[in-house]
């Protein structure tokens, strides 16, 4: 079943570099049509044999020219005397059609049909498939008379042996790997380019006054909680008094009109080891405290905030904001505590759980 190698250049005394690779249209128009019409060729490059009398591996030795593909003019016989089916039995096996027929046209006109066949060793339908392939070209119009044993006087056949499945699959795997690597690299490069093309996020969208005030409020709450755990308490900050520049230690708050100013005396609070026995005493006048302030925010956006804080008379029963009980530490809040955030603390006894 081996193929006998022959030097095509010495077969026809052809010049170096000569190759015979005709198209489907050229095979039908320039060769088969001329052969059926009885025209002679100046160069006989396609042999005339009864192809169905030989096994395919013998055909290369019958060819006039070819290295890996061999061309033949061959007649086709009828399988049945009055039938239209061709006889596909050849040598030790048979040719079996595969795929669909391809219509060949020239100048928009149908000129012939191309059919693909595979050779099987043995008898149909239990033959063994081989790698030998045939492309059969026939004209659209029948070339024989009715009643003849010949189905076609001449058809043109191309014979070749395809590569084994192992070699084909290995080449296919290499191509798939290259394609996959190239596609992944291309996708990664496109993703990087897309990220670089995105505009930078401007910081001014994150520096708005409302956002900053919420962020500062959260940070202040976190600091106050940390101070509770460490034993250092700044009750003025917790009550929201230190958020106003006028209400600082030892300062006199300016008041409009003839109102009596509020004096705030803040002492250093004792640490946790002293059991928090000494507390600040806050004295407030009986008149209301009106405070008007204007706050400007950075970030390119100015927002004017007008707040009015009115301090009411403190509970005469409890002169101080805070009072120690038997548990070691407790606090009583009143609704009179001014708060810049508009939050009023309910009047109830809160046990912090600190003991001496």
Curated annotation (Swiss-Prot):
Q: Does the keyword Transferase apply?
A: no
Enumerate the InterPro entries for this protein.
NAC-dom, NAC_dom_sf
DNA-binding stretch(es), residue numbering of this chain? 111-168
Q: In which tissues is it expressed?
A: Expressed in guard cells of the epidermis.
GO terms (BP aspect): defense response; regulation of DNA-templated transcription
GO cellular component labels: nucleus
According to the UniProt entry, which residue ranges have a biased composition of type Polar residues? 164-174
Name-wise, this protein is NAC domain-containing protein JA2L
Gene symbol of the encoding locus: JA2L
